[in-house]
A protein has these predicted regions:
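Residues that line or immediately flank small-molecule/substrate-binding pockets and catalytic motifs
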Residues: 39, 106, 156, 225, ...
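Charged catalytic cores and adjacent phosphate/nucleic-acid-binding surfaces used
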Residues: 1-6, 10, 20, 25, ...
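Hydrophobic residues within beta-strands of alpha/beta enzymes
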Residues: 35-37, 102, 152, 193, ...
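A metal-dependent hydrolase metal-coordination microenvironment
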Residues: 1-134, 138, 229-232
C-alpha cells in the first residue's frame, strides 16, 4: 500500500503553525511514503494578504534538506476562492514557483452573502444552511468552468462545518443535478477531484458523490485530510483508500509538475 498525503498545511498558512520540516518527520513516523504541502493562497481581495513565494520555497527547501530521500516531498498550494477575482488569482499564480499540485477550493460565502468563511458561518435554520450550499455551488461552477487548478478540493465541504454545528440533517441530495454537471465539466477539462478524509470525521465528498464521479468517467483522484495540526497528519488515508476501492476506483494519483502519477489501490 502506497501512502500519499496530498493536502497538508504548514506554518506557511495563516491558520497553521508547524514548520514543513517537522511535518515531514511526522509523516515519516506515520508511515507515509509521500506528502505534498498545500498551503493556502488566495486572491488578495479575499483576505488582503500577499503571498511571499520566496519564503514558501525557502521553507520547502529546508524540509527537503532535513528529511533527505527518506520520504518524497512535493510543493503545491490550495488556491482558495478564485471566483472572487479570477484576474487576481491568475496574477497571483503567474508569480508562483514551479508547483507540483494545485487544489482549487471554495472556503467563503460570496460577498453578497457577507463573504464569511464557512468555518465561521452559523445558520439559524435549515433554509439558511441550504442557502449556504446554493451559494457554494454557484461559486464551484464558476471555479470548475475556469479550471486553472489540478484537482477540486473537498467537494461538499459546507457539510463539514454544518455537522459540527448540529445541522446533520442537511445534505447535498437536493442538488444532485448541479453536482453532476460540475463533475462532468471537471472531467471534460481533464481535472481531478480530491477525497478529503476530513481527519477521519466523515469524508468529503462522501461515497455517493465519489461513485457518481467514477460512473461519469472520473479517474483522477487524490487523497488528503486537510490537516493543520501535527497530531492529525496522515489521519484517515488508509480508510480513504478502502473507500475508493468500494466506490469503483482501481488507482489514485499523486502529482509531479502537475502531471499525474498513478498508484494502484
Amino acid at each position: 500500500m502506497y501512502l500519499a498525503y496530498c493536502h497538508l498545511h504548514s506554518r506557511m498558512s495563516a491558520d497553521a503553525e508547524v514548520p514543513m520540516a517537522e511535518l515531514a518527520k511526522l509523516a515519516l513516523d506515520a508511515g507515509l511514503d509521500e506528502v505534498c504541502y498545500t498551503d493556502h493562497v488566495e486572491p488578495k481581495v479575499v483576505f488582503g494578504a500577499e503571498v511571499d513565494w520566496e519564503a514558501v520555497v525557502s521553507e520547502f527547501e529546508s524540509a527537503q534538506n532535513a528529511i533527505g530521500d527518506r520520504i518524497k516531498l512535493h510543493l503545491g498550494v490550495e488556491l482558495g476562492d478564485a471566483p472572487w477575482d479570477f484576474e487576481a488569482a491568475e496574477s497571483l499564480m503567474a508569480n508562483a514557483p514551479e508547483l507540483d499540485f494545485i487544489i482549487g477550493s471554495i472556503h467563503c460565502l460570496t460577498p453578497e452573502l457577507g463573504g464569511m468563511n464557512m468555518y465561521n458561518y452559523v445558520p439559524t435554520n435549515d433554509r439558511e444552511a441550504y442557502l449556504g450550499i446554493e451559494d457554494y455551488l454557484s461559486q464551484l461552477k464558476k471555479l470548475v468552468d475556469w479550471g486553472k487548478f489540478t484537482v477540486l478540493g473537498h467537494l461538499t465541504v459546507p457539510l463539514r462545518y454544518y455537522f459540527r454545528k448540529g445541522f446533520k440533517q442537511v445534505s447535498f441530495d437536493p442538488y444532485e443535478e448541479e453536482v453532476r454537471e460540475i463533475l462532468r465539466t471537471l472531467i471534460h477539462k481533464g481535472r481531478g477531484m480530491e477525497l478529503n478524509t476530513n481527519l477521519g470525521d466523515g469524508p468529503v465528498p462522501g461515497a455517493k458523490w465519489l461513485r457518481m464521479y467514477r460512473e461519469l468517467g472520473g479517474e483522477i483522484i487524490t487523497l488528503g485530510s486537510d490537516t493543520h495540526k501535527p497530531e492529525a497528519i496522515g489521519k484517515g488515508i488508509r480508510e480513504g483508500q478502502q473507500l475508493l476501492r468500494e466506490c469503483g476506483f482501481k488507482q489514485f494519483c499523486t502529482f509531479e509538475k502537475q502531471q499525474p502519477i498513478w498508484h494502484t489501490l
